Amino acid sequence: MKYTVDAASKVEVIATATLHGAMKTLFPKLSGTLEGDPAALADTAKAVVRLSMADYDSGDRMRDWKMKKELDPDKWPEAVFTLGKIEGVKRTGDRLEGKATGLLEYRGRKVTLTAEASGTLGDTEARAEARFKLNLNDVGVPPPKFLFLKVHEIVEIVVHLVAKPAQV
């Protein structure tokens, strides 16, 4: 079954910094398609997900201003993830779990990522969550610095996908 990514989807970036605990930034604008048969997910899974880099909210106006300078969304408006494979698929009721590997393209760079993923594929909706670590330097983003605050280069990414059946 083929699905279209819904507006309820979001990406959370969780960063840590010197003199500071975890800081979350929410990126709420995703688009793309998911495809798969729950009975044979390892063989049928496909996905292309696009993330707008211009729309985000950290809950701190100064941090958002600094991030805009680092991300430069006018020059680099989106990041694109293309699923390559899902391995080790386990099913518990309607819930599927496995390792998703794919290619993240951003700022002219390509990074292979592997994430712990789980979700459901139903007739009316698909939901998935994936979690992985990313080194900001790998995608050409210098870890932000502001006064005494320096963000560590390794961040945790949590992707929450909601998708509806694609219109034929």
Feature locations, PLM:
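Low-complexity, acidic/polar, glycine-enriched regions of mature
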Residues: 1-168
